[in-house]
């Protein structure tokens, strides 16, 4: 894998689709429809280095993005990238409003309660429609599901990767 500084992971090529060179990408971005739209510039991170690609077409199919890159005409040209991650350049990320965060800013953050007691580490983000839910891995306990709502999340320090929550009664049971 190459140096990914100033690049942000937006998905992983999990398989090919059909014989015309489409790939199935498992997206890990809030903005998948923008990341994989026609003309979007992406980078495939391979063992040999980062390969720039441009999206020719894309569509959502069974919770995966089916993407065809410009210049790819058959499965043999793309199969070698199965399992590789897909990135965008950091300059392609728009500024977010206050209290909005990119997944990579939240994942691997430590979660503490109002007294500073460690609850766990965010390992995944689940989109529910109304609000995101952060899945927090706890030592020796089942994962905690933390809703991203003002009543619960009190502060997020992106630089320190530290999230403070108000552990409302029953939230961590």
Curated annotation (Swiss-Prot):
Superkingdom: Bacteria
InterPro entries: PRC-brl_dom (IPR027275), PRC_barrel-like_sf (IPR011033), RimM (IPR011961), RimM_N (IPR002676), RimM_N_sf (IPR036976), Transl_B-barrel_sf (IPR009000)
Main location: cytoplasm
One Pfam short name: PRC
Family note: Belongs to the RimM family.
Assembly, per entry: Binds ribosomal protein uS19.
Name used for this protein in its record: Ribosome maturation factor RimM
């Amino acid at each position: 894998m190459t140096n990914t500084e100033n690049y942000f992971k937006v998905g992983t090529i999990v398989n090919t689709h059909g014989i015309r060179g489409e790939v199935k990408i498992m997206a890990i971005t809030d903005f998948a429809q923008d990341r994989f739209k026609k003309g979007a510039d992406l980078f495939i991170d391979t063992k040999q280095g980062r390969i720039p690609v441009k999206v020719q077409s894309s569509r959502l199919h069974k919770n995966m993005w089916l993407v065809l890159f410009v210049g790819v005409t058959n499965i043999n040209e793309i199969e070698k990238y199965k399992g590789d991650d897909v990135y965008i350049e950091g300059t392609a990320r728009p500024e977010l409003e206050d209290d909005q965060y990119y997944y990579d800013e939240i994942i691997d953050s430590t979660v503490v309660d109002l007294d500073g007691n460690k609850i766990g580490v965010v390992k995944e983000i689940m989109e529910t429609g109304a609000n995101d839910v952060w899945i927090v891995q706890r030592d020796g306990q089942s994962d905690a599901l933390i809703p991203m709502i003002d009543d619960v999340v009190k502060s997020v320090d992106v630089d320190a990767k530290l999230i403070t929550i108000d552990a409302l009664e029953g939230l961590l049971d």
